[in-house]
Amino acid sequence: MKPVFKMLLSLLILWTSLLHAQVRIQITQGVDSARPIAVVPFKWLGTVEPPEKIADIISSDLRNSGKFNPIDPSRMPEKPFTASELITSSWYGLGVDAVVVGQIQAGADNHYLISYQLVELSSGTVLTQNQYKVTQQWLRYAAHSASDEIFQKLTGIKGAFSTRIAYVVQKNTRQLPYELKISDYDGYNPFVVYRSSQPLMSPAWSPDGQKLAYVNFESGRSALVIQNLASGSIQKIANFQGHNGAPAFSPDGAKLAFALSKTGSLNIYMMDLASGNITQITDSRSNNTEPSWFPDSRYLAYTSDQAGRPQVYKIDISGHGVPQRITWNAKQNQNSAVSPDGTFLILVNSKDGQQHIAKQDLKTGDVQILTDTLLDETPSIAPNTTMVIYSSTQNANSVLQLVSTDGRFKALLPEVDGQVKFPAWSPYL
């Protein structure tokens, strides 16, 4: 079992009593145009009802990717549990070219054995298969892992279903209304990382998934902190007079970029995490904020209003050269996130009175508007670059939304108990 997931499981158990509303994905657009696939209900080898429906989890994962449309079990001509039982000819006419079969077996000491096979219908070939022996708490993780493997085999893209999201919830209560939460990417297994009577903002994952940087106001003004998720210990990074915000870990894990206004103007700074030394990156009278790292950990994208309105710029952290403006498409561009492969930006594009999430190709400069929701902000990209999570306004509430990076698939993640903001997608865990 991976160390980071042992740590997350311990936190999950610790905070079980604090679980309240859960984010749940609701598909809003894009399923009908996706690739049909069949995920046959898994055979259950046990004496009571299974604790989790593994096939349902895999189906949901594949559907949530926007690339697959699992058919309803009622349309399946048969329900085999192994590839050898599958009659490929019976599936012709459904538009399905791959079938997932499997079973879950109850064992001793609260352990379960999950097995699955992905079968190509045209040849009857088993494309991939695996087994997982897990305790009940890890059943969903095993299902997400199977989804990752199936997704990668069928698309060539590494799956991100076993990743997590961090986000801030402002609850409708007077006592400790602000919560920093982590959940599975699909909203299951949420737990509270930190509670406060004061606002919490801008969570950012370390590249190893073991820490979160964020902004709190415990001292009466903004402060940047890093919290170790295993121990719960909190390290204060910056608590200067004025604004302290917008933390971003470098991909190599050695540096943290952030924005400070300690000298009056809002500028980008960087801390070497080993030494604690802080270096100023931008130096101007304009507002410079929202840093996002390029994959090489040498360059930053950031938002600046040096041209009058917010636009996105690129800067070399070594101090060589001058900042380069990289957005020109709209009146305002901000809240940029550089894709993990460095090929595109996801940002908030403001044009013609609309504020939407957009994708800009960093080679061609082409811009595609991805969303049609209201007051979109703070986008965060999945580590496999296929999906974006962001916050928007719906019925006067702040909610989380998903959109695929091709713009074809959209989903809503409603939180029933409060305003949900500042989503941050984890790295691979």
UniProtKB/Swiss-Prot annotation:
Q: Does the keyword Glycosyltransferase apply?
A: no
An annotated GO cellular component of this protein is: periplasmic space
Q: InterPro entries under this entry?
A: 6-blade_b-propeller_TolB-like, PD40, Tol-Pal_TolB, TolB_N
Database matches in Pfam families: PD40, TolB_N
Where does the signal sequence lie?
1-21
Kindly list the places in or outside the cell where this protein is found, as annotated in its UniProt entry.
Answer: Periplasm
Principal cellular location given in the protein's record: periplasm
Per the record, the GO terms for biological process are: cell division; protein import
* This protein's UniProt keywords: Cell cycle, Cell division, Periplasm, Signal
Q: SUPFAM superfamilies of this UniProt entry?
A: TolB, N-terminal domain (SSF52964), Tricorn protease N-terminal domain (SSF69304)
What is this protein's function per UniProt?
Part of the Tol-Pal system, which plays a role in outer membrane invagination during cell division and is important for maintaining outer membrane integrity. TolB occupies a key intermediary position in the Tol-Pal system because it communicates directly with both membrane-embedded components, Pal in the outer membrane and TolA in the inner membrane.
> Could you give the subunit structure recorded for this chain?
The Tol-Pal system is composed of five core proteins: the inner membrane proteins TolA, TolQ and TolR, the periplasmic protein TolB and the outer membrane protein Pal. They form a network linking the inner and outer membranes and the peptidoglycan layer.
Belongs to which family? Answer: Belongs to the TolB family.
- Its protein name is Tol-Pal system protein TolB
